[in-house]
Curated annotation (Swiss-Prot):
Gene designation per UniProt: murC
Major location (coarse): cytoplasm
PANTHER family noted in UniProt: UDP-N-ACETYLMURAMATE--L-ALANINE LIGASE, UDP-N-ACETYLMURAMATE--L-ALANINE LIGASE-RELATED
Keywords: ATP-binding, Cell cycle, Cell division, Cell shape, Cell wall biogenesis/degradation, Cytoplasm, Ligase, Nucleotide-binding, Peptidoglycan synthesis
Classification lineage: Bacteria, Pseudomonadati, Pseudomonadota, Alphaproteobacteria, Sphingomonadales
Catalytic activity: UDP-N-acetyl-alpha-D-muramate + L-alanine + ATP = UDP-N-acetyl-alpha-D-muramoyl-L-alanine + ADP + phosphate + H(+)
Protein name: UDP-N-acetylmuramate--L-alanine ligase
Keyword hit for Ribonucleoprotein: no
Subcellular localization: Cytoplasm
Known role: Cell wall formation.
Molecular function per GO: ATP binding; UDP-N-acetylmuramate-L-alanine ligase activity
Amino acid sequence: MRGVATDIGTIHFIGIGGIGMSGIAEVMHNLGYRVQGSDIADSYVVEGLRKRGIKVAIGHAPENVDGVAVVVTSTAVKRGNPEVEAALAQRIPIVRRAEMLAELMRLKSTVAIAGTHGKTTTTSLVAALLDAGGIDPTVINGGIINNYGSNARLGASDWMVVEADESDGSFLRLDGTIAVVTNIDPEHLDHYGSFDAIKDAFVEFIENVPFYGAAMLCLDHPEVQAIIPRIRDRRIITYGFSAQADVRGTNVTPGPDGNRFDVVVRDRDGNSRTIEGIHLPMSGRHNVQNALAAVAVALHMGVPDEKIVSGFNGFAGVKRRFTKVGEIVTDEGVVTVIDDYAHHPVEIRAVLSAAREGAGAGRVVAVVQPHRFTRLRDHMDDFQQAFNDADMVLALPVYAAGESPIEGVSSDALVRGLRDRGHRQANVVADADALAASLAASIKAGDLGAGDMIICLGAGDITKMAAGLASAVEGAA
């Protein structure tokens, strides 16, 4: 960090396997700092860090912080954690993840990408276009960028692209030179208390942009559009499908290999031009919207049109964003298994719409693992209306993520609501074995076959089930 030598001692990350923590740890390691960490379990993220030379202990123990200079924690790590308590006893400084990220951002000019949904994909797309334009940014993302094989990378330029997490309000520490807001929906109400407070936080995030920076705002989203009049003395560039957008997507044509579209760009003098023939190798209209945010950033930073087109062509996607993880071979043909991080009703609706687009005449089976009892409680009505594009819904038990159960809030309640709203095939499955057995029975009955898609949805451990689902179903047949 600027003005701080890299020999300050060892920096210890508690929960280093978390997707946000790991990115900061990796970049700091690449900058030359001594970095280590701990996590409660092995994971692909932990293995990736070890391959890069970062020591990771499994399990939290007081001795893990012996001799370290500073401890970094996320909001998920609370008092009572043995490493936190040991650090306090030894008077070792403890800093939050967002504070450390903010220190990294002081090194460079930054594109900070916020929004209730679409942050990770948009961050990845911005990085891809800046790479194509020769800018070579440092990147810290909330998901694995397939082109990098990691969620972080140290670039050679003076620019950094970061995903700004609004969940605990800490994104207000991240002062971007360029800010992007993809959308604003009622989420993380346990922290903010009200939707108005969430909107106020996004206004403050935008106002943190310096006078020489810019804010890229999605004009299609009503709540984003509604806060624009509140922004004073900051340059605003709008994007979306709206005819009023400065960067507007047109002629969107979905296909089996993603989307093709054009972009109409209008400058401040009212003149316009069109970037034609963009190919985005991702399904879903919502991903075209994310791509438009990336176009807005790239154009503002001087990336030529032809480099924008080539940047999209070379984009390899993001792990757990509509990721194909397997195929189930049936007598009729192949059923595709997709893994996706979607865990909010808006996200689920968008992913299932993309699946319906991709499946064509095929059937779409949604396997959902609700994430957190509070989220399911706060959005139960929306969840019960989010599965209209799924021919069949199989709901696993709620992934608690450390929360205590809430009476009346369960996957059974979700399924009852789906049925009450007219869904013809919605059922609860108890675990991974029951899921495999249910899908195998559907294949045997001829209800699932060639051209069909199984979409696994959730932010919990459903990703592990998705990875092994094809072999589990074939074994249960």
